């Protein structure tokens, strides 16, 4: 098996009414935990790494791990560059084998965002690499980037249509009321806006900030056309919470084979639930 482009995964999801879960990874243990569940449930999966992830663990190491697990579990998977902002950075990682990238120019004015995304699309498509971009802007914290509520804004459907036409992007992350991180109260998702975007945009749509969003809300976005669901914060909280609890019960403990497994098992429960919410189980052959 191999590392593949998200384009093929998302096209199938769009055609068959489900979503592919995209889980953020941080180290070898998080990769292993996610893929253990995806293999067991035979779910397609996207492993997403932010620039901060690749500062912590080298791309070459992550790529080697993903390739090995793809063979071990006999399943294709996509390794995705999440929230990258530099063409040069993306170019280097694509040359190293990555076949899926998100270029995030959502903090720029529309025309500047288009220009940046188009430059990435032109390069990536020459390398059989799919490209995701974001229009509108989510609030919250992602990696080292923080966006306050005043700077966040929702995606305009007609601008989304024009953006996709001008850039040739393969998938579009839309801002419809979610945010990166956890919520102090139940998020207000603009389902009508999502439906209007789906009517005028034909590429797969992406939901960022899906951690802590009620399952029924996520399912509704999938019914309305979302085909990729990003999950990051919930994974980290589950892992860290379990490890903290283990140390509270085992204050003299020091063997990572024990406490890391506890964290991985807690993370696996989140992964299992998100696969069920996305409706992606049993969609790759054994």
From Swiss-Prot:
**What does the record's cofactor remark say about binding?**
Binds 1 zinc ion per subunit.
Top-level EC class: lyase
User: What are the binding positions for Zn(2+) in this chain?
Assistant: 83, 180, 208
Give the pathway annotation: Carbohydrate metabolism; D-tagatose 6-phosphate degradation; D-glyceraldehyde 3-phosphate and glycerone phosphate from D-tagatose 6-phosphate: step 2/2
Enzyme Commission code(s) on record: 4.1.2.40
Report the active site residues.
Answer: 82 (proton donor)
Q: Which reaction does it catalyse?
A: D-tagatofuranose 1,6-bisphosphate = D-glyceraldehyde 3-phosphate + dihydroxyacetone phosphate
* GO BP annotations, alphabetical order: carbohydrate metabolic process; D-tagatose 6-phosphate catabolic process
Residues the record lists as binding dihydroxyacetone phosphate: 181, 209-211, 230-233
Name any one GO molecular function.
tagatose-bisphosphate aldolase activity
Q: Per the entry, which co-factors are needed?
A: Zn(2+)
Q: Which PROSITE patterns did the record assign?
A: ALDOLASE_CLASS_II_1 (PS00602), ALDOLASE_CLASS_II_2 (PS00806)
The entry's keywords: Lyase, Metal-binding, Zinc
Query: Where is it found, in Gene Ontology cellular component terms?
Result: cytosol
Assembly, in brief, is: Homotetramer. Forms a complex with KbaZ.
The entry assigns this protein to a family as follows: Belongs to the class II fructose-bisphosphate aldolase family. TagBP aldolase KbaY subfamily.
Entry function: Catalytic subunit of the tagatose-1,6-bisphosphate aldolase KbaYZ, which catalyzes the reversible aldol condensation of dihydroxyacetone phosphate (DHAP or glycerone-phosphate) with glyceraldehyde 3-phosphate (G3P) to produce tagatose 1,6-bisphosphate (TBP). Requires KbaZ subunit for full activity and stability.
The protein in question is named D-tagatose-1,6-bisphosphate aldolase subunit KbaY
According to its UniProt entry, this protein's organism is: Escherichia coli O7:K1 (strain IAI39 / ExPEC)
Q: Read off the lineage from the record.
A: Bacteria, Pseudomonadati, Pseudomonadota, Gammaproteobacteria, Enterobacterales
